[in-house]
Amino acid sequence: MIDVNSFNALKIGLASPEQIRSWSKGEVKKPETINYRTLKPEKEGLFCEKIFGPQKDWECHCGKYKRVRYKGIVCDRCGVEVTQSKVRRERMGHIELAAPVSHIWYFKGIPSRLGLLLNMSPRALEKVLYFASYVVIDPGETSLAKKQLLTETEYREYYDKFESQFKKGKGFKAMMGAEAIKELLKELDLEALTKELRNDLKTAKGQKKVRTVRRLEVAESFRKSGNKPEWMILDVIPVIPPDLRPMVQLDGGRFATSDLNDLYRRVINRNNRLKRLLNLGAPDIIVRNEKRMLQEAVDALIDNGRRGRAVTGPGNRPLKSLSDMLKGKQGRFRQNLLGKRVDYSGRSVIVVGPELKIYQCGLPKEMALELFKPFVMKRLVEKELSHNIKSAKRMVEKVRPEVWDVLEEVIKEHPVLLNRAPTLHRLGIQAFEPVLIEGRAIQIHPLVCPAYNADFDGDQMAVHLPLSAEAQAEARILMLASQNILNPKDGSPVATPTQDMVLGSYYLTLENTSDFKNDAYFSSPAEAVMAFRQKDIDMQEPIAVDVRNYEKKDFSLPENNKPSDSNLLITTVGKIIFNEIFPEDFPYVNGEKPGLNEYDWLKSGERIEDKLKQREPREAIQKGSLGDLVGHCYRKYGSTKTASILDKMKEVGYSYATKAGVTIGITDVAVPEKKHEIISDAEGKVDEVEKQHHRGLITPQERYTRVIDIWNNAKDSVTGAVMDNLDIFNPIYMMATSGARGNISQITQLAGMRGLMADPTGRIIDLPIKTNFREGLTVLEYFNSTHGARKGLADTALKTADSGYLTRRLVDVSQDVIVREEDCGETDGVEVGAITNGNEIIEGIGDRVVGRFAAADIRDRQGNMIVNRNELITEDAAEQIQEAKLDQVPIRSVLTCKTKNGVCVKCYGRDLATGAVANVGEAVGIIAAQSIGEPGTQLTMRTFHTGGVAGDDITQGLPRIEELFEARKPKGLAVISEIDGRITVKTEHNKRKVIVTPEKGEQKSYNIPYGARLKVKDGDEINAGDEITEGSINPHDLLKIKGVRGVQLYILQEVQKVYRMQGVDISDKHIEIIIRQMLKKVRIEEAGDTELLPGSYVDFFDFEKVNERIKEEGGEPAKAKSLLLGITKASLATDSFLSAASFQETTRVLTEAAIKGKVDPLIGLKENVIIGKLVPAGTGMPHYRNIDLAYNDEENEAQSDKSQDEQEIGEITVDMGE
């Protein structure tokens, strides 16, 4: 076997007949497989042991030699080499064909490679190959042209005329079949052909130019790769090893076999028949028919169904050919090379483990014993509880009592990986320290559920065991759940309390000012808590506490705003208890945010009651504020301390959710009195509108819009009434306002009215549902509400599949983007401003620049320096930028990074998952793809109509994201201006025209399509690339007008718009990485003195390199245009044929790669996974792999191993804390 680490690249090419024979261990001459009586392989058949090796280890066919001691001997009776049976997975055979046949990939692919080389149409080729016409090889003295087709009668005519020449082998010659094509290919002179084609290119135009470029490309491929064109015609066919196309006996004595064996049998049968016919000297027509059948049999073997009807097996099922073995989800690439099943794994149902620490998981005992079996056996022998491994294995299998103690020892500090499918982002696999538990379900910590998107309604999870010391170290340092607190997509905490924990914290920190009894003052927090335990005060009652005796909090922090003349803090017992979660140098949390204001302090002589009247009640802790607190802790203390704070939050949350005793009953759903009044009021208004419509005062469209408005307003009023009607301790109200479960609109549906519903097309029905679920719906109302419900379910199902496919394409396009160096030296950057929608700021400038490096010095309006060039913009700096109200800030961006095959640290900035600057080796491409793909399921699917409003529906949600990333011409296209200038709007013959007049140069006029809405008025100033009508811009047009930078920023803003509308935050840098990959290629317009072919796609960096070289030599450089490729196209245009072939269109990619003799440099992650090397990212990068460790002696070895681990963990915690 070859060692995967001993090579750096992989080359693919065409195999010559000699090469195929050299692979082979013998010729397969008979179609037989297995003898039905002896069940042994037939000699010279498809499973022959002489050719492919023995079926049983160390045993020849006739049984003369058995046992290892005869290793390597070839049996003199049966000719089988005595060796291991696994050679039957690697030894190949071959079939010598009686007549050459063409390879269907090169003849039938689009464009037909054979057709391009010979300059023949695929139709003509087909006629020749399948024996319908003759082709002239040598016209001799006839008036025919070379490569001209002749019918049978024409051929006879010429043959009779020029018989004498024909006999001598000179002059006129015409043939049919693959032999004829092979003759023509042999005669090709590639050097001359490429010269001639390059000359033709200079004059060619239109279609002819396109074809010439294509022909030149194929000819050049053959010339450069050293492949010979005649190798596209096969004389010999390789037979793949028999264990890759097995034949197994089923229970009933019947045999099941791989389809390939049937296909090979057909080829061998036809080939043998052809040989016999040729030996007998059969008539031409019979031989010809046999040759055609052989050609068809070989076609079916290589790619069944590519030409004509597919060969079917029993039950009319098309047989799976060699090509089908590679293609699709079940093919070799995606099924076995990219996704293998692994040993040391198990799966089980998950249940909640509320008493676990965040980095622990409960592992069922029997499962752990099976997973850790080898470790337990080794330990048993070490402890001399058993004498050898065999008896240790017996002990484990019999489950002796002492085994459990050893298991406890073994699993200590040995992390396991837990994975939940679907793994949408990297947080779908995390490492935990196992804790042995009884039962058969895996326990997981409630705080890691959001990351896995797990719940406990029967979800299952898989457990994997990292085996080597390195794998364990990586699992512990990088993947432990306590290290994965932040979400890589936007840097917000993902491990935040949910549901019960939120409800508990909310109940605990509520402030109830409604039934304020008396002023209560306490000398210390401990005294207040004691009074609460004695039931002297309520948990939610405002009290004043002297903070001088508060040991656990530091009130001198600036955030606490403590006045010098006051020591009394107005708070509640609940908040005192809640604040015990945080360290003493954390600001006191009295409302949503950490920190206090002047209304929280009581000066001497003031009363609590008076102070409460001056301010609104302080907010209770909701889900959002809990998340903010976690983020605050992470920035302040780093991951390890935050993890323990999270565990305390969980304890407090659950404990007080239990004490709150929140239940839900029908009486909690209180329908407000005002509801009926509001509804009858609305009905009156609707009647009024209907009357106006009947009198013809308003159009049906106006009536519809007004009715919808009336009911929407009515629903809003009802919502208000419902909320006013609920007590702050109402369980439903608490659940919704705390963010634990449900929302206001659901409360309105329970207690108010359900409101307007959409019909199946998405149009809103103007008859609302006036009742709520408490009162019950009428039959018609129930029917109306089924549309929306059904659409919701159908949408969800479709969305999941579409979103998964989008993620797959994104990963494929960006998988080779890795942080490769510290600084690429690029001086240019991108100007970034706030994202706005109309006048509303969607994302402020501070949020957009935080964690990036400045591309130039950033100063405020007074000229004071905020950030120097190439410095990281921290949270504080971002705040200063926000306060300075700067419009644009220059930052380093992935879009301008000069690193080849990746990005540099300075252009990427901060790694959002750790909050520190990214490391070299970080696989940022895949993180980007996951960050965009994972929220895809939350985006809406189809376009919603707001009830027949005129104008095209602008696509939104998932389809819009797909439209942008695939760089398609959008639906609802906007007309855009190609020049800067002033607008004039004209109407001629009922058609609207917009004329743009520039200051200099000629004006441009644009016809406005019917029904389009203008975005500009007469006399407006407009810039090139701006929209004239509403709609979406075609990115390809924008590329022509505004260039690369314009289209980059447009796609970025548009993608962000879709996600922001759904309330999903994604960092710009992720989208930038995908856009960078879409704009990586250029199309060569003029070749100059370079070797590049006009019309070919070339990587931008390679193009610049070639041009630099030509300039140095004094030649004329090539000219090229920027290309915008959709993500599917960009994935297929990658340099790696392995990555492209495993993505889509496998046969096309491999055909092209083989002709070009492509070399896969193994740069991306996918290609390395396919061939089984470590991925070149993270610790798999070359400069991490080439480190040698030297040890002094055994003892030090153990010591240094341990201390190094500790150091690394120590360092990591220090880093995080910075």
Curated annotation (Swiss-Prot):
Entry's cofactor comment: Binds 1 Mg(2+) ion per subunit.
Annotated positions binding Zn(2+) 1? C60, C62, C75, C78
Question: Molecular function (GO) terms listed?
Answer: DNA binding; DNA-directed RNA polymerase activity; magnesium ion binding; zinc ion binding
> Which residues does Zn(2+) 2 bind?
C824, C897, C904, C907
EC category name: transferase
Please give the InterPro entries that the UniProt record associates with this protein. DNA-dir_RpoC_beta_prime (IPR045867), DNA-dir_RpoC_beta_prime_bact (IPR012754), RNA_pol_asu (IPR000722), RNA_pol_N (IPR006592), RNA_pol_Rpb1_1 (IPR007080), RNA_pol_Rpb1_3 (IPR007066), RNA_pol_Rpb1_3_sf (IPR042102), RNA_pol_Rpb1_4 (IPR007083)
Named cofactor requirement(s): Mg(2+); Zn(2+)
What's in the GO CC field? DNA-directed RNA polymerase complex
**What UniProt keywords apply to this chain's record, in alphabetical order?**
DNA-directed RNA polymerase, Magnesium, Metal-binding, Nucleotidyltransferase, Transcription, Transferase, Zinc
Keyword presence, Transferase: yes
Q: Does the keyword Cell membrane apply?
A: no
Which reaction is recorded as catalysed by this protein? RNA(n) + a ribonucleoside 5'-triphosphate = RNA(n+1) + diphosphate
Name the Enzyme Commission number(s) assigned to this protein: 2.7.7.6
GO terms in the biological process aspect are:
DNA-templated transcription
Residue ranges of the region described as Disordered: 1195-1218
The entry marks the following residues as binding Mg(2+), namely D455, D457, D459
Tell me where on the tree of life, at the top rank, the source sits.
Bacteria
| Pfam family name, one | RNA_pol_Rpb1_5
HAMAP family reported for this sequence: RNApol_bact_RpoC
Described by its record, this protein's role is as follows: DNA-dependent RNA polymerase catalyzes the transcription of DNA into RNA using the four ribonucleoside triphosphates as substrates.
Instruction: Return the similarity comment.
Output: Belongs to the RNA polymerase beta' chain family.
Could you give the subunit structure recorded for this chain? The RNAP catalytic core consists of 2 alpha, 1 beta, 1 beta' and 1 omega subunit. When a sigma factor is associated with the core the holoenzyme is formed, which can initiate transcription.
Q: What is this protein called?
A: DNA-directed RNA polymerase subunit beta'
Organism listed in the record: Natranaerobius thermophilus (strain ATCC BAA-1301 / DSM 18059 / JW/NM-WN-LF)
Q: Lineage from the top down?
A: Bacteria, Bacillati, Bacillota, Clostridia, Natranaerobiales
